[in-house]
């Protein structure tokens, strides 16, 4: 059969070949994206409050509480009648 030295040599060569054949640059092929979480139990709530307080956008596509144009500016542009604000002709 095979001696212990031959078996160990074969295993060493096989492991070495498998190691070098499967090695690929991790940072170039598959970047690691880690989900950022707060450490506390209220991490999601704290994150939402931080985002709103610093003027960040809200999640899930909702608009922020301060629109780009105020109602007073819209009245000045389109007149005092509110019925034609969104009636573009």
Swiss-Prot record:
The keyword Secreted applies. Residues 1-23 form the signal peptide. It is found in: Secreted. It comes from Caenorhabditis elegans. One of its GO terms (biological process) is neuropeptide signaling pathway. GO terms for cellular component: extracellular region. Residues 24-35, 64-89 form a propeptide. Its main location: secreted. This is FMRFamide-like neuropeptides 27. FMRFamides and FMRFamide-like peptides are neuropeptides. Keywords: Amidation, Cleavage on pair of basic residues, Neuropeptide, Secreted, Signal. The modification Phenylalanine amide is found at residue 60. Belongs to the FARP (FMRFamide related peptide) family. Each flp gene is expressed in a distinct set of neurons.
């Amino acid at each position: 059969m095979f001696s212990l030295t031959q078996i160990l040599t074969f295993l060493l060569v096989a492991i070495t070949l498998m190691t070098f054949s499967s090695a690929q640059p991790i940072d170039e092929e598959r970047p690691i994206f880690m989900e950022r979480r707060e450490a506390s139990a209220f991490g999601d709530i704290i994150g939402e409050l931080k985002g709103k307080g610093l003027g960040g956008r809200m999640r899930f596509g909702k608009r922020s509480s301060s629109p780009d144009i105020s109602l007073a500016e819209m009245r000045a542009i389109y007149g005092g009648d509110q019925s034609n604000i969104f009636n573009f002709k």
